[in-house]
């Protein structure tokens, strides 16, 4: 090991401590906050290094690049780098493989501290440390449930935004350095998802900030905000993720820089409920059901799916809505028109994921709203307003 643990700790704004669980937790959280999960460095490494045996960005390369340009890496690189850092600080660690989609496509660490093993999965990454024997884990971003399996520990997300893989397995067997490197090298196959597109992710307190396909997504425990970046993506992403803009620009030149599929930002709130998806939608799927939902916050006039809403006792104020139901998609698409002519698109819908039912409320904003990348108060206030509607809906179930 030739990288300086002192320099890395300085960059992470942490002091060296004796190995302990609180120290491990601080290192884990700060690593996920400051060291981005990103594919840009992998894309550049693949293009610049022709020898397959030398393509993996081993810890010395990983930490040098982090200190120089703010890059991080993807699964195997992150696990190896965090392992080297922990080992340099005196922690007892061992590497293990796992499964997200196929066996051995994932890696993580087991760390022994205080007579107990913990899974430090910085490769996915999970939002918190997981007991090696299983258990329930609450974090600001999502709750996790871990249970022992025949091969190791299965981990599933039981809350949070219902998107992406919601289950993974960490195998208990220790993987040798030789086997770890062999599997790592295989991740440089030409069709690898991390070589064909620039993707970025880091934790920011109670939020996960992600970038893919031209848009930034900000996820918290109950909502997702999608913000399209319509211009100067390398520069804007450098500001958000702390990665050198030239690194991002070069990665985009190799992997492509597609335009976002949306032009207007949108905020989506989610609420998990113990209800059949069809019955959940049926509660608001008729004009009477929708009126009943909205009568809790406004006076409602009109017929069918064309309605007018106004504050109690102020019929001259308010707005009009035209609702389009989609029974097959379990959704209501709403066009809201204010007196000055401004229009807002909203939706209610029901989604099912891994056997769980989610009530969903979405608002499409006007414009890209890049200000929401910095103004978390405004983002949270808008998401909170949508969440209130979901709570009202849930009372009818």
Feature map (PLM): residue ranges:
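Hydrophobic ligand-binding cavity/cleft-lining segments
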Residues: 260-301
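Short, low-complexity Ser/Thr-rich regulatory SLiMs
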Residues: 97-99, 146-148, 325, 348-354
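Hydrophobic/aromatic-rich core segments of domains that either
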Residues: 80-147, 154-158
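Glycine-rich portal/gate segments that line the openings of hydrophobic small-molecule binding cavities
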Residues: 288-345, 353, 395-396
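Secondary-structure boundary elements
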Residues: 2-70
């Amino acid at each position: 090991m030739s990288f300086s643990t002192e320099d890395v700790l300085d960059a992470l704004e942490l002091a060296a401590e004796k190995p302990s669980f609180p120290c491990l937790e601080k290192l884990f959280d700060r690593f996920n906050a400051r060291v981005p999960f990103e594919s840009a460095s992998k894309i550049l490494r693949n293009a610049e290094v022709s020898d397959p045996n030398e393509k993996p960005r081993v810890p010395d390369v990983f930490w040098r690049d982090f200190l120089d340009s703010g890059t991080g890496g993807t699964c195997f690189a992150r696990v190896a780098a965090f392992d080297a850092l922990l080992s340099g600080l005196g922690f007892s660690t061992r590497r293990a493989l796992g499964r997200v989609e196929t066996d051995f496509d994932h890696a993580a660490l087991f760390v022994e501290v205080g007579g107990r093993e913990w899974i430090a999965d910085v490769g996915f990454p999970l939002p918190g440390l997981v007991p090696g024997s299983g258990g329930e884990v609450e974090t600001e971003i999502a709750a996790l449930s871990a249970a022992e399996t025949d091969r190791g520990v299965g981990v599933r997300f039981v809350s949070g935004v219902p998107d992406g893989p919601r289950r993974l397995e960490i195998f208990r067997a220790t993987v040798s350095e030789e086997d770890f490197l062999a599997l790592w090298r295989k991740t440089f196959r030409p069709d690898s998802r991390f070589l064909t597109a620039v993707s970025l992710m880091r934790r920011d307190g109670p939020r996960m900030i992600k970038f893919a396909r031209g848009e930034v997504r900000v996820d918290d425990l109950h909502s997702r905000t999608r913000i399209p970046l319509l211009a100067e993506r390398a520069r804007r992403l450098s500001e958000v993720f702390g990665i050198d803009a030239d690194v991002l620009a070069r990665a985009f030149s190799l992997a492509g820089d597609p335009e976002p599929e949306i032009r207007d930002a949108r905020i989506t709130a989610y609420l998990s409920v113990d209800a059949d998806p069809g019955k959940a939608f049926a509660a608001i799927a008729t004009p009477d059901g929708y009126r009943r939902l909205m009568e809790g916050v406004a006076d409602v006039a009109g017929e069918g799916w064309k309605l007018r809403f106004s504050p109690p006792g102020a019929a001259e104020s308010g707005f009009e809505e035209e609702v389009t139901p989609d029974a097959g998609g379990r959704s209501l698409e709403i066009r809201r028109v204010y007196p000055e002519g401004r229009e807002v698109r909203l939706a209610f819908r029901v989604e099912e994921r891994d056997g769980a039912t989610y009530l969903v409320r979405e608002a499409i904003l006007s414009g890209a709203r890049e200000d929401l990348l910095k103004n978390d108060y405004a983002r949270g206030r808008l998401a909170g307003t949508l969440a209130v509607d979901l709570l009202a809906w849930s009372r009818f179930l």
